[in-house]
Structures are given as structure tokens and as C-alpha cells.
């Protein structure tokens, strides 16, 4: 009996040590995957470059050599990046305008017409889209031609397609996500269900937040199949009668086969934090856990996820860090 007791104690001790070891490995792996790369807001990522702003300067961080280049621009917000071009909203002159920065030559130009303090530019190739005063504009920076393409806000662009939110274009809908074809100049309504907003597009996939309840949920439309699915949960009730869902629509982004989003409530659907959703598998994975009511701004390119804290919800200077996670690690 004594030997049996000793063997049992040894076995329990071994299990405990293995358990502790696994916890340490897990903690080390998490620490290795998530890295602080700076302080500021509104990060965006393309290729090996991450861009963000602290309101005074634009930061351009190279993932290969880990260098941080700054571009002076007081009153900067909402930067975006594609290839070797940066674009952001600039209020350094006292009048809102869009700044366009060429990385190789370090030269800057401005778009000054039809820009307001709420303009948030998006860039793809040589084309930039933004909204001002409930109108959506397109600029081809290779020709300097600017065109009004719709009535609405929050546009995004992929190749020759632009998506945006509109409450006045579709006579059969109070609110809708619209899609504009640059080549044909034709428009279609992607969805008019619920309260859709902040659309994004990549390839044949259009995503948006339906914010009819609480912080909303994510839906996705495939232009090739003409099918719509829910990416995250609408407001629902769990087996214990508690509400869950409608907590994932505050900030969303898409690139290739991945959607990233912020979840701000601990409920039946999962813990709060930064998530990545795999379109092929239909599975969501928690990348970084946060307490409830923390509003992050994740963006994605290939296996790189970057995020900061939404500046509209920041409580102190401790909340303005920019983080990076390489999903391939």
C-alpha cells in the first residue's frame, strides 16, 4: 500500500509538472506571437509595411528590418496603405484634405476638393475612395481625375469595385450596402437587411457590420455565388436564457481568406478580444484576449494581424499601443 501511495504521489507530481510546463510553453508561445511595435492609433498593413498615426506623425514600420520611419503630418488620421503609397486624412493646415505619400521618393501631394473632417480614405492600386458630406468620391492618382460615384459614406475599394453605405440611393431600401463598378459605372444593392454599415471588399467577398442590435454582427456576401452568410452571431439566447451575439461589429477587415474583428463582450459566443475568421473553414480563432468593453481596430494582410485601441474609447496613454501578431509563427 505504501509503494502504491508513493507511485500515486509520483504520478500526480509528474502530471502537475507537465501541466505547469504546458502552461509555460503556452504563455511563451503567446508572448512570442504578439509584439508591441509602437504607440498610436488606426493601424493598417500591406506586405511588409505597417502604418499608423499618433496624431502628430505618420509611422511606417518595416516588418523585415524593424525600422520605424516617420512622416511629419500634424492632424493626421485614418491612414491606409497599398504597395508603395500611403494616404491619410490631414488637417495640419486647418482645412481637411487627403495626403498621398509616395514611399520610394518620400514625396507628398494633396487632394483638397470634397474632403471633410470625417473623410476616411481607402486605396487600391492608383485609386483612392473616400466620402464627404454624404457623397462618395473616387480619385485616380495616375490621371488626377476625381469623380463623384455615389451618395453615401464609409467606402472601400478592391480592383474595379467600390462598396459603400447609403441611405438614399436605393428607392426600395432605407439603408443599404451598395457596390459600384468603375468600368461599367453600374451599381447594385448588396444588402438592405437590418442596419448594415462599414462595408469592406476583397476579391468576390463583401463584408459588413449589421448594427441593428448592440455592437452588431458580421455578414458576408459572395458576388460569385450571390449568397449571404452570417460570419458571427446575431443577437440570440444561449441555453441558459442569457443574451449573446451582436458584439462583433465595431471594427472589421478582410483580406484573402481571412476576416479580422473585435469582440467586446464575454458571452456564449466567446471571450472578448481580437479574432481572425477563416473563410474556407468557417472557424473563428481568438488571437489576443482583452477585458470586456475594449474596442480594438484589427487589420490583416496574409498572416500578419495588427491592431490598436479605437481612439474614441481610449481612457489613458496606456491604451494606445500598436500590436502585431504573425499567425504563421
Question: What are these model-derived regions, one by one?
Answer:
Residues 32-38, 67-72, 107-113, 144-150, ...:
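A short beta-strand motif characteristic of beta-propeller blades
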Residues 50-53, 86-89, 128-131, 162-165, ...:
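Residue position within the beta-strands of beta-propeller blades
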Residues 56-61, 96-100, 134-139, 174-179, ...:
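A short loop-to-beta-strand structural motif that recurs across blades of beta-propeller domains
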Residues 295-329:
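Blade-level signature of beta-propeller repeat domains, shared across WD40, Kelch, NHL, RCC1
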Residues 21-33:
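Sec-dependent signal peptide cleavage junction
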Residues 62-66, 102-106, 140-144, 181-185, ...:
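Short loop/turn segments that connect beta-strands within beta-propeller blades
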Residues 57, 91-95, 167-172, 211-215, ...:
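Short glycine/acidic-enriched loop and turn motifs that connect beta-strands
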Residues 39-47, 75-83, 116-125, 151-160, ...:
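Repeated scaffold domains used in trafficking and secretory/extracellular systems
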Amino acid at each position: 500500500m505504501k509503494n502504491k501511495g508513493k507511485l500515486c504521489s509520483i504520478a500526480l507530481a509528474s502530471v502537475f509538472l507537465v501541466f505547469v510546463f504546458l502552461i509555460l510553453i503556452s504563455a511563451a508561445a503567446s508572448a512570442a506571437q504578439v509584439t508591441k511595435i509602437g504607440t498610436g492609433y488606426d493601424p493598417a498593413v500591406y506586405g511588409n509595411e505597417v502604418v499608423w498615426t499618433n496624431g502628430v506623425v505618420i509611422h511606417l514600420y518595416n516588418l523585415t528590418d524593424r525600422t520605424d520611419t516617420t512622416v511629419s503630418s500634424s492632424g493626421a488620421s485614418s491612414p491606409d496603405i497599398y504597395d508603395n503609397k500611403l494616404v491619410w486624412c490631414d488637417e495640419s493646415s486647418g482645412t481637411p484634405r487627403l495626403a498621398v505619400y509616395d514611399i520610394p521618393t518620400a514625396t507628398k501631394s494633396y487632394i483638397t476638393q470634397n474632403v471633410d473632417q470625417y473623410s476616411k480614405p481607402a486605396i487600391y492600386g492608383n485609386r483612392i475612395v473616400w466620402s464627404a458630406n454624404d457623397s462618395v468620391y473616387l480619385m485616380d492618382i495616375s490621371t488626377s481625375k476625381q469623380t463623384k460615384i455615389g451618395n453615401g459614406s464609409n467606402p472601400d475599394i478592391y480592383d474595379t469595385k467600390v462598396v459603400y453605405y447609403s441611405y438614399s440611393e436605393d428607392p426600395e431600401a432605407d439603408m443599404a450596402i451598395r457596390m459600384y463598378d468603375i468600368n461599367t459605372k453600374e451599381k447594385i444593392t448588396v444588402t438592405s437587411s437590418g442596419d448594415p454599415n462599414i462595408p469592406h471588399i476583397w476579391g468576390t467577398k463583401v463584408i459588413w457590420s449589421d448594427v441593428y442590435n448592440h455592437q452588431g454582427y458580421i455578414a458576408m456576401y459572395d458576388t460569385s455565388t450571390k449568397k449571404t452568410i452570417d460570419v458571427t452571431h446575431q443577437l440570440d439566447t444561449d441555453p441558459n436564457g442569457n443574451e449573446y451575439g451582436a458584439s462583433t461589429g465595431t471594427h472589421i477587415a478582410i483580406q484573402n481568406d481571412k476576416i479580422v474583428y473585435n469582440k467586446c463582450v464575454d458571452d456564449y459566443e466567446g471571450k472578448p478580444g481580437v479574432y481572425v475568421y477563416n473563410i474556407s473553414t468557417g472557424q473563428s480563432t481568438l488571437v489576443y484576449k482583452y477585458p470586456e468593453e475594449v474596442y480594438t481596430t484589427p487589420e490583416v494582410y496574409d498572416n500578419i494581424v495588427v491592431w490598436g485601441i479605437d481612439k474614441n474609447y481610449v481612457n489613458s496613454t496606456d491604451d494606445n499601443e500598436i500590436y502585431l501578431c504573425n499567425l504563421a509563427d
